Amino acid sequence: MKNTKTSQEQVIELKLSDRQKKVLKSIVDEYTISATPVSSKLLVQKEFKDQSSATIRNEMMFLEKNGLIEKQHISGGRVPSLKGYDFYNKNLINKNNNVSDNFKMRLHKILSKRYSNIDEILNAAVSIINETTQLPAVVTKTSSDELLKRIDLVKINDNSALVLIVTSSENILTHSIKLDKNTKFNDLQTCFSVLDERLVDTKLSLISSKLDLIVDIVRNKLEEVEYYFSKIVHRVFDFYAYKPNIDSKTYGVKYLTKHSEFEDQQKLNDLLNLLEDSTIWQQIALNKKTDGLAKIMLGNEIGHEHLAIATTQINLANTNHQITVVGPTRMDYAKIKALLDFLKIEIEKILGSTNEH
């Protein structure tokens, strides 16, 4: 019978003894710090002083046979494989990893300041994440549930006008409109004035479905109302009905030079391409599986073999902000996860969350 289990399911099912788990964890932790293949001799010196080198070698052979560690170079040391990192993150990661008092103090200082909006708070917080992890991060803002606070129409010239939409998160969205011979600016302004009166505090994503209810109101004030709604108004708001507003920004790219992996130009290019690929950040931001605490995704999950990401979603009243730390597979997962979890919990606690933990 054909085995249909995925490699991740097989990792979870793999049974290791307590000593084998400790050996694997020691290899991951040591390699994270040193970036050097780990030998049985080193493990005995540091973690297993009451064990012989032969015993630890046998345990390492078992781990290698099961694909959890691998030989990287000619040297006798071993490094974690993707399968090994996956097992580590699911079973061995230190869930009680303490966030430093310095990080807590700096974050609380940011949250106590009177910033104008959440974007400025996150910009300041992510800079601390960059500095602490020595890794870049991507912040993705999804605002499909923003509320309409004001809508206005501004005439640019005889041939064009600009729709201004102010949202509940203080974003100002603009849409340009061409004015042809069949379009009277004053009539169009009447349409948008009624929308401004009737649709305040409506979700942008729902406005398109409510426009038909507004037509009868406008019809009492304006002839040819169907023309203006079908040709112009619907086009403006249909955009929000089908496509949430997603914006991504990258911070801390300068820290890539701190990591030996990126002395390899190909690996550096791979990461830079990932950072510039807006589609993957949109997919992560729209993935509701990241609503909980920090999620770790390895190279085989994101299509980049030598890279990994740790991501968390901060849920506020009308916007979601995805913060994703990006780096080599040899990153300090426990530390990064603890930082992201703390950041999420503190910001949602102070600014208000749409979810409960």
From Swiss-Prot:
Pfam families: HrcA (PF01628), HrcA_DNA-bdg (PF03444). Gene3D superfamilies: 3.30.450.40, Heat-inducible transcription repressor hrca homolog, domain 3, Winged helix-like DNA-binding domain superfamily/Winged helix DNA-binding domain. InterPro entries: GAF-like_dom_sf, HrcA, HrcA_C, WH-like_DNA-bd_sf, WH_DNA-bd_sf, WHTH_HrcA_DNA-bd, WHTH_transcript_rep_HrcA_IDD. It comes from the Bacteria. GO terms for molecular function: DNA binding. One of its GO terms (biological process) is negative regulation of DNA-templated transcription. Keywords: Repressor, Stress response, Transcription, Transcription regulation. Belongs to the HrcA family. Negative regulator of class I heat shock genes (grpE-dnaK-dnaJ and groELS operons). Prevents heat-shock induction of these operons. NCBIfam families: hrcA. HAMAP family: HrcA. This is Heat-inducible transcription repressor HrcA. It comes from Ureaplasma parvum serovar 3 (strain ATCC 700970). The lineage of its organism: Bacteria, Bacillati, Mycoplasmatota, Mycoplasmoidales, Mycoplasmoidaceae. The gene is hrcA.
